[in-house]
């Protein structure tokens, strides 16, 4: 992620490349001698057995402190500036509807909950919004479907072009 991998030397080993997005394909081809017709895209797929429509998990909504009339916006991902969470909170601060709540699922480092200077800034920004913002920290992948189901809206405020857009 964020590294260039194409090279004419590697192109002699194989006759094509499979990329997860146009962005990855185009980035690879910038440093490659492969013809564009030899670069295929296979977009990320969704496991429809895990991520399928189902009633929202009311027990989880309640445990997280959301009322029945709350409109829950979900951000799920790594907590870093490029992901645009701070901009999402700015937008939330401009919405005069108190029952719009933001649930932030994720951490600065994949796979573990750990502090970072950016997370501390987000927590400070969230204080100004009172109880409208809630952080869960890292949530294991197998538990994520319930978090998506409890949300009324999923937000992906990324500020840079994503290589694969795993969350969306």
Question: Each predicted region: which residue ranges?
Answer:
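Conserved donor-binding/catalytic core segment of Leloir-type glycosyltransferases
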Residues: 18, 58, 67-83, 89-92, ...
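Nucleotide-activated donor-binding/catalytic signature segment of Leloir-type glycosyltransferases, i.e.
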Residues: 115-142
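A conserved, positively charged/aromatic
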Residues: 1-20
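Short alpha-helical donor nucleotide-sugar binding micro-motif in glycosyltransferases
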Residues: 138-139, 146-151
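Acidic donor-binding loop of glycosyltransferase active sites
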Residues: 149-163
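Glycosyltransferase donor-sugar binding loop
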Residues: 101-121
């Amino acid at each position: 992620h964020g590294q260039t991998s194409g090279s004419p030397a590697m192109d002699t080993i194989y006759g094509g490349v499979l990329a997860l997005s146009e962005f990855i394909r185009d980035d690879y081809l910038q440093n490659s001698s492969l013809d564009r017709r030899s670069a295929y895209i296979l977009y990320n797929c969704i496991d429809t057995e895990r991520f399928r429509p189902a009633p929202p998990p009311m027990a989880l909504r309640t445990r997280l402190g959301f009322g029945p009339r709350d409109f829950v916006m979900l951000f799920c991902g790594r907590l870093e500036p490029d992901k645009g969470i701070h901009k999402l909170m700015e937008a939330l601060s401009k919405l005069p509807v108190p029952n719009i709540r933001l649930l932030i699922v994720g951490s600065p480092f994949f796979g573990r909950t750990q502090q970072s200077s950016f997370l501390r800034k987000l927590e400070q920004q969230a204080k100004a919004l009172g109880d409208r913002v809630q952080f869960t920290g890292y949530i294991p992948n197998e538990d994520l479907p319930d978090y998506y189901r409890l949300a009324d809206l999923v937000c992906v405020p990324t500020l840079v072009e994503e290589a694969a857009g795993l969350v969306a």
